[in-house]
Regions:
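Amphipathic alpha-helical core segments of compact helical bundles
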Residues: 32-39, 59, 63-67, 71
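Short loop/turn elements at secondary-structure junctions
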Residues: 65-132
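Conserved short "hinge" loops at termini or chain/domain junctions
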Residues: 1-55, 103-132
Length: 132
């Protein structure tokens, strides 16, 4: 089954370039993971003809996972960096990326929620969750 979103859509939405360290393989893996999580939760009719909100939700969830991956790498890097069109200071890179990822993840889950099956698990759609 084909993913609902694409690498191009994730890169465009989050303004992520190849030079940011986000490889095609990384983004495609995050898209596949987001897709698997969404398909396991939404109603069958939404799988065959996904509403725009589900497509955008998948883009946001895949982008959030990509930002978290980049954030983990950048947390170890001491250089100044420019990511998603913003200059990020050395001490703020990791928190800024994680904050952006969390907001995207929450919005993606909110967009997908109306299309979930009534029997969907109560766990969040989030690809990565913070420890509680």
């Amino acid at each position: 089954m084909a993913n609902f979103t694409s690498e191009e859509a994730v890169r465009l939405k989050f303004r992520i370039e190849e030079s940011d360290g986000a490889t095609t393989a990384l983004i495609e893996a995050n898209i596949a993971h987001a897709h698997q999580g969404i398909v396991s939760r939404i109603r069958p009719e939404c799988i065959e003809a996904p509403p725009d909100a589900v497509i955008i939700g998948e883009t946001l969830l895949a982008g959030a996972a990509t930002l978290r991956s980049l954030g983990a790498r950048l947390a170890l890097d001491r250089r100044e960096t420019r990511l998603a069109g913003h200059q990020i200071e050395t001490g703020r890179r990791f928190p800024a990326l994680i904050e952006t990822a969390a907001a995207a993840e929450a919005e993606g889950a909110r967009l997908i929620a109306p299309y979930e099956r009534y029997t969907a698990e109560s766990e969040p759609v989030a690809l990565l969750t913070e420890a509680h």
